[in-house]
């Protein structure tokens, strides 16, 4: 997974500006601006909201489920470009609420496209944000839990 991430970041850095926030010391990739880790709860939402593209590369050992990072990006109002995740499609619409890619080349093509099409990118980010507010608030999740409990009783 880390090799996949590094490969994607390297390919992306050849076609657009890339900044990586990381805890890893000694991370040096040509063409990638490496910044030290920022606080996930305080600073990361601001970074997500203000970045043109937020990349999610899910670890290969995570076989099912929606990555929390994907929800965090959309919840902050950021544009999400993620590897394919079938569970995400159960709640949201690909190309309307987020964008997915199938490999590094596809990721780069889509990153360039959405950097060049700012209005479309911002619309997708806004749709994703609205969808998170509709479906993933504490109120909504608690209601779902009570619905499950009621069915079991």
Language model features: what each stretch is:
Residues 1-63, 67, 79-88:
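Nucleotide-sugar donor-binding catalytic core of glycosyltransferases
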Residues 9-13, 45, 112, 129, ...:
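Non-transmembrane alpha-helical segments in soluble domains
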Residues 42-43, 106, 110:
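Short acidic active-site motifs
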Residues 72-75:
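Short alpha-helix at the nucleotide-sugar/activated-sugar donor binding site of glycosyltransferases
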Residues 94-95:
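Glycine-centered loop/turn motifs
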Residues 98-104, 114-118:
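Conserved acidic donor-binding segment of nucleotide-sugar-dependent glycosyltransferases
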Residues 113, 120-134, 144:
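A short, well-ordered alpha-helix in the C-terminal region of glycosyltransferases
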Residues 138-153:
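C-terminal alpha-helical cap of glycosyltransferases
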């Amino acid at each position: 997974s880390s090799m996949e991430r590094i490969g994607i970041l390297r390919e992306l850095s050849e076609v657009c500006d890339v900044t990586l926030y990381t805890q890893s010391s000694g991370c040096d990739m040509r063409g990638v601006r490496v910044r030290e880790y920022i606080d996930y709860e305080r600073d990361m939402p601001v970074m997500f909201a203000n970045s043109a593209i937020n990349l999610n590369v899910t670890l290969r050992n995570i076989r099912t489920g929606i990555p929390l990072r994907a929800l965090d990006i959309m919840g902050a109002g950021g544009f999400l470009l993620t590897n394919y995740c079938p569970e995400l499609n159960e709640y949201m619409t690909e190309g309307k609420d987020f964008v997915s890619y199938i490999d590094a080349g596809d990721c780069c093509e889509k990153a360039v496209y959405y950097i060049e099409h700012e209005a479309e990118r911002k619309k997708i980010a806004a749709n994703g944000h609205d969808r998170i507010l509709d479906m993933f608030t504490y109120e909504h999740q608690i209601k779902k839990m009570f619905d499950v409990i009621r069915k079991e009783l």
